[in-house]
C-alpha cells in the first residue's frame, strides 16, 4: 500500500496505477466469489466454530480425487507463502524503515517483533482478531489523514497527476530516461503485480478467516470481500499514488524521477516536504503498522493451511 505503490510508479511509470485500478475491479469480483464459496462450503469444528477456505470448496465443490489433490496443493503453497509474502517481505520493510527513521538496529526489530508475535499468535485466532480490530482502523486513519494533508497541500497538481496516470496506462507519454522500462507492457505488468500483492484478491488466503465469520448468508460475506478490495486499492493505494505524483519528485509528463529522489522512498520524501523530518518518521510508523498487521494475518493463514491440510482434509466429504 505504501512502498509497493511507489515501486510500481518507479518501475512501470504513472500508468501502472491505472492498471492497479483495473486489477482492483477484477479483484472485487474474485474476492466476492471466493468468499461466497468459503461460507457456502465451510463446516463446524468440534468446538462449535466454523472452519473453511479454498481447501474445502476445492475438495467439496470439485469433488473426487482432483478436488482433494488441488485442496492439498493449495494448503501446501499457502503455508509456504506465509513465510514469504506474509513474513519476510513485510518484516524487511519494517526493519529497514525503522532503522532509517529512528536508528533502530534491524536485529533488535526482528527480535522484538518475533517475541510480540509469539504472545499474540499463541492466543489463537481470537487474540489476533482482537489486536487487528484495534490496529487496522488506527493505522488506516493515521495514514489516510497524513496522505490527504499532503495531497491537499499540492491540490493544484492533482489534475496533472491523474492525466499522467491515464496517458501512461496506454504508453502515450514520452519516454523518460530516469524510469525503468516505460510503455504499456511495464505499466500493465507492475500495475497488476502490485494490485494483486496489495489486496490478495483471488489468492484464497483471506477466505480462511472470512469463513470463521458469524454470518448466515454467503452473499453478505462476499460483499465484505468487495469492500476490502475497494478500500485497500482504490482508496489507500490511490492516495499513495497521488502523494507521490503531486509531490514534485516525479515529472508527470515523462514519469521521470527528479534528481535527488530515492525510488521506493518517494512517499517518505513527499511527507517530509510537508511535515519536515516528522514525515519520514510518520511513514516508518505507518509501514510498521501496515506490515505487522499483514504478518499477523498471514501467520494465521499459514497455521490454518497446515491444520486443515494435515487434519481436516482427510475427513469424509
Model-assigned labels for residue ranges:
Residues 14-21, 60, 65-73, 110, ...:
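Membrane-interface alpha-helices at helix entry/exit sites of multi-pass transporters
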Residues 34-42, 148-164, 172, 176-182, ...:
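Extracellular/periplasmic helix-exit of transmembrane alpha-helices
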Residues 26-33, 111-125, 136-156, 189, ...:
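Selective recognition of specific alpha-helical transmembrane segments in multi-pass small-molecule
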Amino acid at each position: 500500500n505504501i512502498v509497493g505503490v511507489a515501486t510500481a510508479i518507479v518501475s512501470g511509470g504513472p500508468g501502472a496505477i491505472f492498471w492497479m485500478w483495473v486489477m482492483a475491479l477484477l479483484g472485487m469480483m474474485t474476492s466476492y466469489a471466493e468468499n461466497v464459496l468459503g461460507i457456502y462450503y465451510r463446516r463446524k469444528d468440534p468446538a462449535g466454530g466454523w472452519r473453511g477456505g479454498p481447501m474445502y470448496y476445492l475438495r467439496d465443490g470439485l469433488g473426487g480425487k482432483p478436488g482433494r489433490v488441488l485442496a492439498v496443493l493449495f494448503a501446501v503453497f499457502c503455508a509456504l507463502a506465509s513465510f514469504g509474502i506474509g513474513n519476510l517481505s513485510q518484516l524487511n520493510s519494517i526493519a529497514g524503515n525503522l532503522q532509517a527513521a529512528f536508528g533502530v538496529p534491524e536485529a533488535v526489530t526482528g527480535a522484538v517483533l518475533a517475541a510480540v508475535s509469539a504472545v499474540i499468535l499463541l492466543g489463537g485466532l481470537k487474540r489476533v482478531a482482537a489486536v487487528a480490530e484495534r490496529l487496522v482502523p488506527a493505522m488506516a486513519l493515521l495514514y489516510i489523514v497524513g496522505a490527504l494533508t499532503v495531497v491537499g497541500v499540492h491540490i493544484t497538481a492533482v489534475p496533472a497527476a491523474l492525466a499522467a496516470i491515464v496517458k501512461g496506462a496506454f504508453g502515450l507519454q514520452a519516454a523518460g530516461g530516469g524510469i525503468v522500462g516505460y510503455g504499456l507492457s511495464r505499466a500493465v505488468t507492475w500495475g497488476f503485480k502490485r494490485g494483486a500483492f496489495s489486496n490478495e484478491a483471488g489468492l484464497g488466503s483471506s477466505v480462511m478467516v472470512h469463513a470463521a465469520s458469524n454470518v448466515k448468508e454467503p452473499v453478505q460475506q462476499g460483499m465484505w470481500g468487495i469492500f476490502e478490495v475497494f478500500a485497500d486499492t482504490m482508496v489507500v493505494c490511490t492516495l499513495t499514488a497521488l502523494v507521490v505524483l503531486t509531490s514534485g519528485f516525479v515529472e508527470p509528463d515523462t514519469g521521470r524521477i527528479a534528481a535527488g529522489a530515492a525510488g521506493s522512498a518517494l512517499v517518505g520524501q513527499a511527507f517530509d516536504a510537508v511535515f519536515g523530518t516528522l514525515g519520514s518518521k510518520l511513514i516508518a510508523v505507518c509501514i510498521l503498522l501496515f506490515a505487522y498487521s499483514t504478518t499477523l494475518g498471514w501467520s494465521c493463514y499459514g497455521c490454518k493451511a497446515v491444520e486443515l491440510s494435515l487434519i481436516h482434509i482427510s475427513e469424509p466429504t
